[in-house]
């Protein structure tokens, strides 16, 4: 999966102690590396190869873009072309007639230097709403880059209708071979074939240049196969395929608007540690594990400023009275999943933001990565007052966490047990958020829940 040729013997991409690829200007790419010693080779020469996102080894017949006598600090400059925005540069030696990579291939890590449509970021309230400030961006439906409405956040989606932009391991023809089938709702995008890369890059470049969107979310709850379908392989391969798409999307977007932000999206499953063999092991990977693997893969090929979009729904979605689970089937189990940190809701958002403060998860500048809560709806199934109190609590959770930049409410969902539409008290509470009336409903919500301080229910 993703590997197009067989790796040579003793392939060691970790040989180099560092490597990077950056734009010096709009015409020149600088590639540098640091080696611990001169590598053994057939000819004493270092070769630089251009590689596609889906290539993880270099064919013996590949033609290098540059070469130089071996040294401890090799440095190359190569011309920038539009296609090199989406390819990697790999450092290799000849060994036994094979091209052996001695460093992790590197993408251009500063695509924003190319941006010609950079826009100042808009002042954003903490609270926003799906359908008003947020839209789903279905690929191949916006090929001209024109989006009606003045949205600021878009979630990039693939409904599977266009097989060219759908990952080869997500297409209808291969689904019967899935050893652990799920019911797909959306599909992995295709950064494993040239045509898919070109289509994705072209469309997202136009949208980034021509729309008001400044936050782009690549996929919906991508730690769950239902929402980003690919046949079962293993989680490392799955995340690698997603990472390839994310890179293409990131460079397409940031090379147009340097102030745009690009996010990976996870759901509530945080640290459940389902073992192999458990049915759920094949359905989702914990958000924490997904981010750890994704971050390592991205950093190895040139760290970039990705962010996290999380969906902090209550657990379960069908029950909004989170402070009293006595009326919820399996309420004790559900409450324990949250209190133990296995599931993440607005009650325990610090799980995510504390994790993102660890050294290995910081952005290239050393900052904590951008965090938005891109979808949450509170059911009215337990009554509008319960819905109103839970709604206010979710807002307080976002407001009190210094790393959460936005919470985006889904207010139009209407299924029998998960109806997030507002009325009466819940509408009044929602309207107050971010206004002078907010304090009035703060007191009401605490009294309704039966607490004196929000720290009693929000961590």
What spans do the regions from the language model cover?
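Aromatic-rich peripheral "rim/lid" segments of glycoside hydrolase catalytic domains that contact
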Residues: 103-106, 117-124, 171-180, 217, ...
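Conserved, mostly hydrophobic/aromatic
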Residues: 207, 216, 221, 249, ...
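Short, compositionally biased P/S/T/A/G/V-rich stretches that sit at domain boundaries
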Residues: 1-25
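Solvent-exposed loop/turn segments flanking beta-strands in beta-repeat/beta-sandwich domains
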Residues: 38-51
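N-terminal substrate-binding region of glycoside hydrolase catalytic domains
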Residues: 30-32, 52-64, 69-218, 222-237, ...
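Aromatic/hydrophobic beta-strand junction motif of beta-rich domains
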Residues: 26-40
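Noncatalytic carbohydrate-binding groove/subsite architecture in carbohydrate-active enzymes
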Residues: 239-385
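Structural preference for beta-strand elements that scaffold enzyme active sites
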Residues: 131-136, 149-153, 214-217, 259-263, ...
